[in-house]
Structures are given as C-alpha cells and as structure tokens.
C-alpha cells in the first residue's frame, strides 16, 4: 500500500487539478535533509519541481528500504500517469484532490490494472469508461464493488455464471513484488450484482472444497473473496482489522461487506463478526484458532469444515 500523495499532488493549472511527480524529484527528496515541520507537504526540489511529502520516504525503495516501491521504473511512470489521467478526467478539483492525498491505495492492484489495460485481448484496454471505473474502485473513491469486469486481473483458474477466480501473480511485479517463492493467493470476483442462484454458489463451494482445501476463503470487506493459505490468515486479520478501524475513523457509516457466509471460512466469518461488534484485535483473532462447526446453511453434500490440524497451521 502507498498513499496517493506518493504519485501526485494537487495543483491549479488549466485543465488539471493534479500533477504527477518525476523520478528525479523523488530521488532528490530522498537524499535531502528536510526539517520535520515541513515533512507533510510536497517538497520543492528547486530543480525537478515538487516531490512527495518527506513523511512518505519509507514508501520508496532507496536501495536501503526493500519494502518500499521500486519507483525508478517505467511501471511507476505508468501508474502515476494513469492516476493523474483519471483524476483530471473526472475533474476532481484541487480542493477535493487535497482531501484524498492521504488515502492509501494498493500498488499491486494498480500495477495489475496496467497489465490489463496493455493486454489488447482484454475488454478493459478498449473501454475508457471501464478503465475510469476500475481505477476509482481501486482507489476507493466510489462505492461500487470490484466486479469481474473491473477487477485487478490475474490468471483465470475457475469461472461459472456467477463468479470468476483469479490466481494473483505478485511475484513478477515491478513496483512491489512479493519475494516469497511459496506465495500463492487467489481472488474471487462476482460477475454481476444480481442475486446468484444457489446452484451457481454450490459449484463454487464444491470447487473450493475439493481443489483448494489447503486454503481459507476470506473477505477484506470490499465485495470480493480472497483464497489464502491458512498460515497467512493471521496476517490478513491484522491488516483487515487495522484497515477497517482506519476507514471507520474517516467514515463512521462505512459498511464492511461480509459476502456469502456459505462461501467464507467459518472461523473468518466469526472473526469479522467480532470485529464489527467492537471486540479487540487479539480477542477477535482467537476465533481463528477455535474449532467451529461448519455453517448450518452449507449445501448438502458440500462442507467447508476444516480439520483442527489444518487450523493449527495458523501462525
């Protein structure tokens, strides 16, 4: 994740409310000694124009911070250009742009959208309106859920009338690659917003139960499912809890999308319920380690029950 301010800044130019930073400006900012009292504002490099606020230094890989973005790349330029294009295209205005600069966005999600846009076989590449909608969803600026047509993409490994399951290949990414050679993760998006027939849901549950029984099906509350290794669920819980509390502070009316509990891993559904009821993180996470009965509404002949020794892999 990185704040929008790591890519662009509000401006008041003819036809533009936001402008992007250059790589040269970022390099200058990373090497400059800057008073802390000025760290929350874009830094004037005197030579290359404005650079991101120094408070976000750790978001960039300067050679000593491998967890930061690899900003000195063509991919950084593409993502920054895309964000500026979309925000200026909707005529966001300088004041509104200033309000959203601190909004965190998924760098990997945006890089995947670039790959979709560059793929001439993908419908996204030829539809400017769909591109705009996909980016605004990725930024959290509209309430629409990430559906299959607006998804970040990946390799499709399963699809039926209601759902599409994507294998996420973050290991080959440029900006923030995942270096764990054992990383495997999937995302399931809805194909439409209409009610989905039980038969279609059962097809998905059966696929997950028998083909992905070493994985937990969870949700981050954004209208899609995540299929992750049991050993990573605790880390996902930390991130989801932190993100939920952060969003709730900015927007008390925010609604966490719990999705279909027949698909979600029972323990994760319990974790989410406890989080939404105001329980502390540690208390909520204990439910991830507790043996639970499968959802009573699960489909006949298909179970999402997990063995206790599988749950104990949580770390």
Curated annotation (Swiss-Prot):
BP terms from Gene Ontology: viral genome replication
Region (RNA-binding): 204-240
Catalytic residues (positions): 224
Binding site for ATP: 106-108, 187, 220-222, 226
GO cellular component: host cell cytoplasm
GO MF entry, a single one: metal ion binding
One Pfam family cited in the UniProt record for this chain: Rota_NS35_C
Domain of life of the native organism: Viruses
Compartments where found: Host cytoplasm
Primary location: host cell
Cofactor requirement: Mg(2+)
The protein's enzyme class: hydrolase
InterPro entries found in the cross-reference section: Rota_NS35_C, Rota_NS35_N, Rotavirus_NSP2, Rotavirus_NSP2_C, Rotavirus_NSP2_N
E.C. number(s) listed in UniProt: 3.6.4.-
Keywords: ATP-binding, Host cytoplasm, Hydrolase, Magnesium, Metal-binding, Nucleotide-binding, RNA-binding
Subunit structure: Homooctamer. Interacts with VP1; this interaction is weak. Interacts with NSP5; this interaction leads to up-regulation of NSP5 phosphorylation and formation of viral factories. Interacts with host DCP1A, DCP1B, DDX6, EDC4 and EIF2S1/eIF2-alpha; these interactions are probably part of the sequestration of some host SGs and PBs proteins in viral factories.
Family note: Belongs to the rotavirus NSP2 family.
Function summary: Participates in replication and packaging of the viral genome. Plays a crucial role, together with NSP5, in the formation of virus factories (viroplasms), which are large inclusions in the host cytoplasm where replication intermediates are assembled and viral RNA replication takes place. Displays ssRNA binding, NTPase, RNA triphosphatase (RTPase) and ATP-independent helix-unwinding activities. The unwinding activity may prepare and organize plus-strand RNAs for packaging and replication by removing interfering secondary structures.
Protein's name in the database: Non-structural protein 2
Species of provenance: Rotavirus A (strain RVA/Turkey/Ireland/Ty-1/1978/G7P[17])
């Amino acid at each position: 994740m990185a704040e929008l301010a790591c890519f662009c800044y509000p401006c008041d130019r003819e036809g533009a409310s936001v402008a992007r930073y250059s790589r040269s400006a970022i390099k200058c900012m990373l090497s400059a000694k800057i008073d802390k009292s000025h760290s929350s504002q874009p830094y004037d490099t005197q030579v290359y124009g404005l650079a991101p606020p120094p408070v976000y230094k750790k978001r960039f890989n300067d050679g000593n911070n491998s967890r930061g973005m690899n900003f000195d790349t063509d991919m950084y330029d593409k993502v920054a250009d895309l964000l500026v294009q979309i925000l200026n295209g909707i005529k966001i205005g300088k004041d509104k742009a200033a309000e959203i600069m601190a909004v965190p966005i998924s760098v990997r999600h945006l890089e995947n959208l670039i790959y979709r846009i560059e793929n001439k076989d993908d419908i996204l590449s030829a539809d400017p309106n769909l591109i705009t909608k996909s980016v605004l969803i990725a930024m959290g600026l509209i309430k629409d859920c990430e559906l299959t047509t607006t998804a970040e993409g990946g390799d499709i490994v399963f699809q039926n009338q209601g759902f599409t399951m994507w294998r996420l290949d973050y290991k080959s990414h440029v900006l923030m690659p995942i270096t764990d050679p054992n990383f495997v993760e999937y995302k399931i998006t809805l194909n439409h917003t209409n009610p989905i027939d039980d038969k279609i849901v059962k097809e998905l549950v059966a696929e997950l139960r028998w083909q992905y029984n070493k994985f937990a099906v969870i949700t981050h509350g954004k209208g899609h499912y995540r299929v992750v290794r049991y050993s990573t669920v605790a880390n996902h819980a930390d991130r989801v809890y932190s993100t939920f509390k952060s969003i709730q502070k900015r927007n008390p009316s925010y609604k966490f999308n719990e999705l279909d509990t027949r698909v979600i891993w029972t323990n994760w559904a319990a974790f989410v319920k406890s989080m939404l009821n105001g329980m502390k993180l540690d208390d909520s996470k204990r439910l991830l380690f507790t043996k639970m009965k499968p959802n009573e509404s699960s489909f006949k002949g298909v179970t999402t029950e997990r063995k206790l020794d599988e749950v104990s892999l949580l770390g």
